[in-house]
Amino acid sequence: MKRVVITGLGIISSIGNNKIEVLTSLLETKSGISFSKEMERSGMRSHVWGNIKLDNYQENIDRKIFRFMNDASIYSYLSMKQAIEDAKLTSKMYQNNPRVGVIIGSSSGSPRCQINGVSIIKKTKRLKSVSPYTVIKSMTSSISACLSTLFKIQGVNYSISSACATSAHCIGNAMELIQLGKQDLIFAGGGEELSWELACAFDSMGALSTMYNSQPILSSRVFDYYRDGFVISGGAGILVVEELNYALSRSAHIYAEIVGYGTSSDGYNVVVPSGNGAMRCMNIAMSNIQEPIDYLNVHSTSTKIGDLIELNAIQQVFRKTSIPILSSTKSITGHSLGASGVQEMIYSLLMLKYNFIVPSINIFKLDPKAKNCNILTTMMRKELSIIMSNSFGFGGTNVSLIIKKFV
């Protein structure tokens, strides 16, 4: 099997719009959570989010394609531009090349575009009033459709949509295709819009934090006893995933090698995880790993049930060894749903490169059931070699990715 490495990254997130801004926020444990007037006006109970702050984002986007793009596509476009520059790829290396592809997904497409379309019909009573661009904007494959066109990609071109595991699946699938020799390079990741139209559904099911509306930066509190739900976020992330020899042939900078990918299904409950699927997933990812995991960026989102189920699964997986250092970057960033897997992989890559571990913040009283789980609550400087990142989603879908420092 061919070896697979990561040579470039780009990100738009609640804690920064490029890798330097994101690195600074991580090192300072600077929260990206803020008050949302939009959510308050909509009548939601939760008034906090991990907002995306962008200026002049339409700049240099072909208008013929821009009209088809939703917010997630725009975030992903900006991330892909960064990733291409970061990987030092010339247009000749990726344009019109059948060995270069895109696998970029979204968990929801664009509820904002869908609701806008329906609202126009209700208001005008005319189907023809709906924008002809609504279909493309609303598709969960909108990102890959738009980016493959803008960047002239001729290799694989599709999206995976698997709730909050979406972009992690995209990375894992990219790894497999390259291992099998079907592609040399794949742009992999995902994006998610941030809007009341998307957030309201989670608010209605009681999944979002509501207790800390007046203190937004305290609202995402993974493993804290008083956690009361997750904080919704958005953005995008793109990785340049390459076959090792292909990367070496062009003297590419290598962030890390992807050495493990596990995926599984709970087959248990649509919204409540079983824990068994997560255990199988982590074990599959580690099946060819000999060295210990130095750090695990958990999926845990700040929900009463989900956080403890993941911790129990981790305890079972590592019961014969020692539990790796654990933390959740979502305590700083919020939960960007389909974009979370790739964003958290980027946070992990930066930690691996610069040898530090971001703590879980806002743990004022650790949940008693989370004791003795090696949860990090203060910034740590540590030489790192191997990192695991978990991403789980509704429907019992699970992904574990493992990266190793390339020496």
UniProtKB/Swiss-Prot annotation:
Transmembrane segments: none
Enzyme Commission code(s) on record: 2.3.1.41
One function term, GO molecular function aspect: 3-oxoacyl-[acyl-carrier-protein] synthase activity
Keyword terms, alphabetized: Acyltransferase, Cytoplasm, Fatty acid biosynthesis, Fatty acid metabolism, Lipid biosynthesis, Lipid metabolism, Transferase
Ranges where the Ketosynthase family 3 (KS3) domain occurs: 1-405
Main location (coarse class): cytoplasm
Subcellular location: Cytoplasm
GO BP: any one term: fatty acid biosynthetic process
Enzyme class: transferase
Known catalytic reactions: a fatty acyl-[ACP] + malonyl-[ACP] + H(+) = a 3-oxoacyl-[ACP] + holo-[ACP] + CO2; (3Z)-decenoyl-[ACP] + malonyl-[ACP] + H(+) = 3-oxo-(5Z)-dodecenoyl-[ACP] + holo-[ACP] + CO2
Role description: Involved in the type II fatty acid elongation cycle. Catalyzes the elongation of a wide range of acyl-ACP by the addition of two carbons from malonyl-ACP to an acyl acceptor. Can also use unsaturated fatty acids. Catalyzes a key reaction in unsaturated fatty acid (UFA) synthesis, the elongation of the cis-3-decenoyl-ACP produced by FabA.
Family designation: Belongs to the thiolase-like superfamily. Beta-ketoacyl-ACP synthases family.
Subunit architecture: Homodimer.
Protein name: 3-oxoacyl-[acyl-carrier-protein] synthase 1
Lineage: Bacteria, Pseudomonadati, Pseudomonadota, Gammaproteobacteria, Enterobacterales
